[in-house]
């Protein structure tokens, strides 16, 4: 059996995967012929994968795959005509309006080689730095903070630090869901080392539920919390004065400001929203342990003060002398598989390749290397600015690669309108179905994961080869190839690349040149400059900096450990934040702060995962999580529809330096079902970022968010924007299986859900007559079934006696087993089918808890009850153990024991079942004197 080692296509952990096939010839294999497992030799995951990673092969069966270039009209083109059209249009646009009238918008899904060629094309030959990436939306605040502190965008540590730390502090990071494989490593290390886990997050997330200390701070209080920590460390004389004097600058200024906060811990605790006991406990944990590591993610980055907040964390570790030491320091958790690779090649509009800026010497080096007279001489427009310029008509041609900005950028309606109005839009995609692809004037078929080859760099600076193992069908091409074809047709030299290996060779050579001229730069691929194609193809996972070929394969490499930094003075910089107070907002009566985040089993805008049935099952429709107290306050009902709309002119009260009113542009609204979740703060709502028009009639959450940004990084502040929530009254709602209409009069809610055996659509109508009329024909069979007081209106559409469409409606949410209901499609409609249909409807449905095993809430409830009864019968009520029951349940069902991302949900479900069983027994036995039973489920 032949095996191909590659990397996962999802988060920044950068897991290795092994793909094998029994077929001797890989040129004609498809997903059905393959087996995928974790690569047990890869240093990121050692064989482990999360639920999404385990289903990577399922992602290949896209419902609609783009195989040939085509125009918006649908007319197909060959590559020669498509590339000529793009080249001619870009050239004409630049000739008439200048180089900054064009732009490229890239993605952390691209490989480093794709990124490099795109940046060379734009900054070196088109002479514009209007090249940005969707990494701006997730990583740029951390990038800006590290550049300010260290002089370069460099994560100092590695994953091994998480396994050596005495205290791990996760800030704004639901790592159990966003980086599940890494979180399992963290939990294992905590258990082995008796370490402490601190989670700082306004939400009681799956990660927070497993922490030794959870600080549920106010939104935006991260900066104040860590600035106060710096003052506390100084007050307690815990800072490393010798290190500070020898290796840093700016401490005296920042510490004076910080000590004003730490002077009164009670006031500080009130500001950040925790008890003084919790605040002191956290500060003492940091002060009294030698190995403390702080890792942050989107909860910090996606804020209008994200850069300052990150610098506040770095300040603390600089003061302790932690940077570059084992088990210590600051670590930025990357969201995408190649966000770091894109930054290395200059994928952000604010930098050049190899971590260079726009100084004249850096420009000249790059111009000489690329053999051009000049390159782009100033920073370009970043993501939000780029699409603002598009809306204003300043950018007249844009090429979007591997990303879906109509969904992922804030103020989605404005983005869609800007693209619709733009004279020329090119989109490179694997599917024509994304919201952005539908607005392309030219749509180019790109090779996706499994087809393309190149490299990616993960959160800890490890470069991994992503290898193709399926031959691309149709005319799908690598993104670097498409850019090169256009560049050559525009008359540019330097794009005669034979393959991805030759691109990487050029990139490594540029890195060596930059290191030679600017020796303080940390980024270094000098050791990879002499790789042959065969050596490149066989390259093992390797962590940079790589000064010599002898370092190929190295891991656990830390930088800045000697106190030498990439700043002009060689010293790290303490950064004094512009404002340290927690932002205060006065919210009207029907207003909450909307927080956005991930669903456990989905990825980005769902173009890769939305069609995978097992990953869709846990959350079939858009939902908004609300505290139970808000339902009556806002006149909402659980399971009911909610309209979520942005409040205009609600500017976070930081200061004029950090809040630009011009950036607070008009936004629209979205809709979701209300879900009661008392882990949500009472002033907050939570909705996932994944939904789009591709799957939902009311599109996604960014419909309701405006485009406020961090003033330094220009990263959008997706977290905690004020919104109004109002109920949406549905006359009828339900599910339709089989044939369906994509639009109908009065249809205000429609969500497509992929099942193992087809697709169903969740629907809702504001008018009863419209609901009954939907898909009704003179031959439709209709009747009413009442289940537990709920009337259900059933309609069967038939063709030659076979069921073609099944509609189940009610006045409230319909809860049926979707897979089993869909099995009726295509079967003869007779008395037996109707009897089985009634039985299935009455059986109801149970929520999916574990995507890896398919275990539902009902499965866990049944097994916990069985364990409870068995223990009572064998040991007596006084000696029962919840932990034993939970362990046995997980062992039998497998839930929470594979990727581990559902562990907290499994435990929560089991705990409720256990409590219900105990409550039932109370009338038969006095258990007040049995503290061990109560403690088991506390």
From Swiss-Prot:
Its cofactor is [4Fe-4S] cluster; Mo-bis(molybdopterin guanine dinucleotide). Keywords: 4Fe-4S, Cytoplasm, Iron, Iron-sulfur, Metal-binding, Molybdenum, Nitrate assimilation, Oxidoreductase. SMART domains: Molybdop_Fe4S4. GO terms for cellular component: cytoplasm; membrane; oxidoreductase complex. [4Fe-4S] cluster binds at residues 8, 11, 15, 50. Its EC number is 1.7.5.1. Pfam families: Molybdop_Fe4S4, Molybdopterin, Molydop_binding. One of its GO terms (biological process) is cellular respiration. It is found in: Cytoplasm. Binds 1 [4Fe-4S] cluster. GO terms for molecular function: 4 iron, 4 sulfur cluster binding; metal ion binding; molybdopterin cofactor binding; nitrate reductase (quinone) activity. It catalyses: nitrate + a quinol = a quinone + nitrite + H2O. Residues 1-64 form the 4Fe-4S Mo/W bis-MGD-type domain. Pathway: Nitrogen metabolism; nitrate reduction (assimilation). Belongs to the prokaryotic molybdopterin-containing oxidoreductase family. NasA/NapA/NarB subfamily. Nitrate reductase is a key enzyme involved in the first step of nitrate assimilation in plants, fungi and bacteria. This is Nitrate reductase.
